[in-house]
Amino acid sequence: MNAHAQACAVTSAASPDGVLRERGQREVFCGLTGIVWLHRKIQDAFFLVVGSRTCAHLIQSAAGVMIFAEPRFATAIMEERDLAGLVDANDELDRIVTQLLARRPEIKLLFLVGSCPSEVIKLDLSRAALRLSQRFSPGVRVLNYSGSGIETTFTQGEDACLASLVPVLPAADRSARPSLLVVGALADVVEDQFKRTFAALGIDQVAFLPPRRSSELPAIGPETRVLLAQPFLGDTARALEERGCRRIAAPFPLGGEGTALWLAAAADAFGVSHAHVERTIAPLKARAERALARYRAQLAGKRVFLFPDSQIEIPLARFLSREIGMELVEVGTPYLHRDHLASELALLPGGTQLSEGQDVERQLDRCRDARPDLVVCGLGLANPLEAEGLTTKWSIELIFTPIQGFEQAGDLAELFARPLLRQTRLAV
């Protein structure tokens, strides 16, 4: 975990649109955390972090891999002699990669992942990736991205990873039919559900990024319509648009309402009638509504404060307010991408207090003053707030857990009900 303190004066000011912009001390996980879910998604990929022992401990602890399993990630640990320039770090990296690929011949895609230490000594991993890719081609493709915690939040690791894939995606034929590309790592079960729903809607040219295997990289071009499944993929979306793809504006598929609007936006882009969309999703939407009903009784009227951490805070706030009936005290987000979140912002209750960026001490003061029923925050804040008598929900759990789609709407609501139920039981 990185605690950033800025030497400049702390700033906290409301913008003309009412968003509180904060530029002060921050507490965040670094982008290396994304490896925890990405290494499970791309089955023939391997993530080699070029970093310190601290980086290695973070990934191993967060992933919770069983000791007899062979994970698809590792850390090339930079020692003092590397940092001091006593050895050629590139030679050492080449040696480690050669050993790794000899031992793990099933690897077809290797990511060299930068960290704070590798960036501090200016180790050029992009040149290393090009050199190693040429050396091990065509059997292995080597790419690189930064998972550094310098000026980032932890979900940017996935954004950087997917953005690194965009330049190597094959170009679609000029005669290719319009296709849909769903962007953002989803659990396999969620991906399969969406595939079935898109097929039922009549959208059969559907691909997902990241794919399950590197051999399944989707072809893209001007006829590719991009549908974001996660709200933190700004760099990836920009890279896809630069290659001619067109993004579909939509809310994100959290809860029954969000999923319905997300699917409807895709259907509209492919000329599917509104009536057919309603007929197709009605049973799924009704099932989500039934699953949410039990949790709405527990959560309606409860006050929630969301600290900026994961970049999914605004879609979560929309879900909690509109589908669960919770009262939004403050909704913080590390970065506010107004274009990608326009549909979500329009659905928030009028007067919702939004904050962008972080000044953790000021936000803690506001949270303490408000005494909300539930606080959604990072791991570093959860235990101290619990000690002060506040009930918390770890925001990182909302990234690790499958929460997208109709079938997972009840599971998403349960994640917020569980800490309140725990608090009730402990109070007895």
From Swiss-Prot:
Q: List positions binding [4Fe-4S] cluster.
A: C30, C55, C116
Which GO molecular function entries does the Swiss-Prot or TrEMBL record give? 4 iron, 4 sulfur cluster binding; ATP binding; metal ion binding; oxidoreductase activity, acting on iron-sulfur proteins as donors; oxidoreductase activity, acting on the CH-CH group of donors, iron-sulfur protein as acceptor
Q: Which residues form a coiled coil?
A: none
Q: Which cofactor does it need?
A: [4Fe-4S] cluster
Q: Which GO terms describe its biological process?
A: light-independent bacteriochlorophyll biosynthetic process; photosynthesis, dark reaction
- Check the record and name the Gene3D superfamilies matching this protein: Nitrogenase molybdenum iron protein domain (3.40.50.1980)
Catalysed reactions, as listed in the record: chlorophyllide a + oxidized 2[4Fe-4S]-[ferredoxin] + 2 ADP + 2 phosphate = protochlorophyllide a + reduced 2[4Fe-4S]-[ferredoxin] + 2 ATP + 2 H2O
What keywords sit in the KW lines?
4Fe-4S, ATP-binding, Bacteriochlorophyll biosynthesis, Chlorophyll biosynthesis, Iron, Iron-sulfur, Metal-binding, Nucleotide-binding, Oxidoreductase, Photosynthesis
Involved pathway(s): Porphyrin-containing compound metabolism; bacteriochlorophyll biosynthesis (light-independent)
Q: EC?
A: 1.3.7.7
Provide the top EC class.
oxidoreductase
Textual note on the cofactor: Binds 1 [4Fe-4S] cluster per heterodimer. The cluster is bound at the heterodimer interface by residues from both subunits.
Q: Oligomeric state and partners?
A: Protochlorophyllide reductase is composed of three subunits; BchL, BchN and BchB. Forms a heterotetramer of two BchB and two BchN subunits.
Q: Please give the function described in this protein's UniProt entry.
A: Component of the dark-operative protochlorophyllide reductase (DPOR) that uses Mg-ATP and reduced ferredoxin to reduce ring D of protochlorophyllide (Pchlide) to form chlorophyllide a (Chlide). This reaction is light-independent. The NB-protein (BchN-BchB) is the catalytic component of the complex.
Q: Which family does it belong to?
A: Belongs to the BchN/ChlN family.
The molecule here is called Light-independent protochlorophyllide reductase subunit N
Lineage summary: Bacteria, Pseudomonadati, Pseudomonadota, Alphaproteobacteria, Hyphomicrobiales
